[in-house]
Amino acid sequence: MTRRTKIVCTLGPATATGDRVRELVESGMDVARLNFSHGEHSDHEDNYRRVREASDATGRAVGILADLQGPKIRLGRFVEGKTYWETGEQVRITVEDCDGTHDRVSTTYKQLAQDAKAGDRLLVDDGKVGLVVVEVEGNDVVCRVTEGGPVSNNKGVSLPGMNVSVPAMSEKDIEDLEFALRLGVDFIALSFVRSPADVELVHAVMDRVGRRVPVIAKLEKPEAIENLEAIVLAFDAVMVARGDLGVELPLEQVPLVQKRAIQIARENAKPVIVATQMLESMIENSRPTRAEASDVANAVLDGADAVMLSGETSVGKYVMETVQTMARIVQAVETDPARVPPLTHVPRTKRGVISYGARDIGERLDAKALVAFTQSGDTVRRLARLHTPLPLLAFTPLPEVRSQLALSWGTETFLVDPVATTDQMFFQVDHALLSLGRYNKGDLVVIVAGSPPGTVGSTNLIHVHRIGEEDH
């Protein structure tokens, strides 16, 4: 059985050779994530090249995702590099530049003294250390430590419930975005999305560079959950980034947000990734915990297009074992025919109705596959959200679309020459499927396409076709 749910792997020091990246692809990586929170541009350029070379060598479509750091709020530096804040003591966070001491340290967020008020919470290092604001004195925010622990240079700070006035992208993000676009990545992930309007800032940079690619909204902030439907509509895909989300929201709400985000994304034919701590223990151990295996399984059961590995593959000790373990868990869950909640959404668009119709025809006629010709990937994504048991085969003349469809559930993509007629389409299907060795002459497939071919948004055709027969 072919795995349908895709796997996203973060590249890093543990995968910093061409052989390691090729092993990742062979183990099951569908999309490579370049994390711009770490590494230099030269590191990302090297990884980009390795992924493209591995994709060409293996014949597998592999997408490349550039994940922007976002305007992360951090502490400054301590004179001694670190300290330990005890529960109950008072510390000061200042917007002034200073050499950090045990009692007073700076922050990169220069509006903190303006935005903070008594009772606000600050969480340091993904919530490991908790503070509550006592008062604001000039440029200093006086806090009481509610949960003590070690703190060190440049640790991240979350401000749950505080209406922070930071832009959607920092200067670093803009530079990284321009670099990633010129490099040729297939997706951009925007961190700390709060509003559907955030995508417009990304598009403005893309238009300046002269290249648009799909933008993924990372759901990490309470404001994103409040604006969830509008954000799903505005962006091209979403990522349920459970690390920061679990700091900003009560932990018990995160599983419900995950399920809701997946459902809304499926209704709108937008790919959805579930990320963070999926097999975290495998950074150090060769086997995951039972809870982690269940977590991966539940993301599949919820209907996610993809599951993501972060530190497990970027710095972990058991990189290939982790990817192979995730692939095995996914495949085991996918053998359950009732694994995904059905979509109650009723399509109202032409392509939506055609995709539902093609799925129904294919399943009722016991077709061997659904085949979609696409210029943009949209029709394929509309088919992918239905999670049909039939193989979903996409044909496109565009290399970037082939790579982008590596993120979509259950999709196997073929790069083909442009065609001028539907007869040429059917010939391409016959040639490609017979060459695979998995299909035979006379097998029934259902083809979705646009006539005339080659025009974005022209999908208007469902054709029931027998491979190798002159029904065209």
What does each of the following model-derived ranges do?
Residues M1-H472:
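Non-catalytic helical/linker scaffolds that mediate oligomerization, partner binding
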